[in-house]
């Protein structure tokens, strides 16, 4: 067996892990981000120096990226303990911040909480959405390289037919996260003009993805790089899936109201599942047109990638609806609490629906992107969003206690208007108003596509230079951390230099 065949076999015929374990793994970085905020506040209280871009980068990398690498590799069997540990650590930091509070030092806790709930917020963007996109991007980047090393648990890799692997969430989470900040969500007035102009711009935005998809295909075929055939097919890749999604969704949003995106998502998934169950569509995906697994012809060669696009369109529409809800103008802490509770209840309802669908209809299948897969992706995305929102609220409370606390990529606090004053008094320090958010989270959010491309390129280069199958645990851990450090540093420097590469 050649090395290419050995590497392909290493990531094939896998069945995944439990939904609960993946959910715990997703929530872990949300609490890491919360602890990051506490550490920044605590360090500002103890030390009065101004952090440089280097210290901010190292802080974010050590507190967020390194634990994520460990969670997907050497600490994979202790996710629940990690989660409990970071919660206890965060609670300890919050208690210390509360004890050292510089605001309302003589007021009892309930009075402080009452004042906090009346605080207003301001932010250029929603920190929870930014952190969601960063977490999914970082998880994906870590996994696409780590999966080729023995230290990466096989249960986290992409499943062959049915099951839930951590990497299965990566593709769906990427689509969902992109949908929450798509042009239709961010600029609703953009769709109120000429529909032809809107669709033309949508077509124009995908042409770079066409080159990226074709370029990736050409490189992989020319160097004989290992491929997982049943993932997308012979020629298809994730770039082509994104292209089709970005071509279909504008047409749907021209026909249907933007705020009814959830109905479109539900309709597509239900009709698609009915087609899988009551037509020959499922047989076509699994066995081709001749029933024996042929790869002759464009459709047979890429049947998984082409047909599963329907599921990703539904996930995108669900992301659009969530983005609309998240971007509504909310200016009070109380409003954020209601949003977090609503998302949490919606996620729980979807997880219950997932159980019912898996028992009575069909198990989760990334290969087909079926109904259960779509429900699982949306439910997991909402549970992560609600965790991040709750973390934002708790971090805002910590900032409320310490005068002048600066935490990049978090809500800015403003005192609620008082009847005898024309304007509200801002709690946002002047430094935070004038200084850009120099943090790794903001950089990865703004440069998500560059980070994704860079991760794919460096993963390929490392696989060509390193014998991943026979690497020791220590060496593999060093390589993966160095790979993430290099990619994050490049993206961070590009962000500081304000180098922007955007296609939509």
From Swiss-Prot:
E.C. designation(s): 2.3.-.-
Domain of life according to the entry: Eukaryota
Impact noted for substituting residue 167 to V: In GPIBD11; no effect on protein abundance; loss of function in GPI-anchored protein transport
Pathway given in the UniProt record: Glycolipid biosynthesis; glycosylphosphatidylinositol-anchor biosynthesis
Lumenal topology ranges: 1-21, 76-81, 153-162, 224-237, 282-305, 360-370, 470-473
Subcellular location per the Swiss-Prot or TrEMBL entry: Endoplasmic reticulum membrane
GO biological process: GPI anchor biosynthetic process; GPI anchor metabolic process; protein localization to plasma membrane
InterPro entries: PIGW/GWT1
Family: Belongs to the PIGW family.
Task performed by this protein: Acyltransferase that catalyzes the acyl transfer from an acyl-CoA at the 2-OH position of the inositol ring of glucosaminyl phosphatidylinositol (GlcN-PI) to generate glucosaminyl acyl phosphatidylinositol (GlcN-(acyl)PI) and participates in the fourth step of GPI-anchor biosynthesis. Required for the transport of GPI-anchored proteins to the plasma membrane. Acetylation during GPI-anchor biosynthesis is not essential for the subsequent mannosylation and is usually removed soon after the attachment of GPIs to proteins.
Protein name: Glucosaminyl-phosphatidylinositol-acyltransferase PIGW
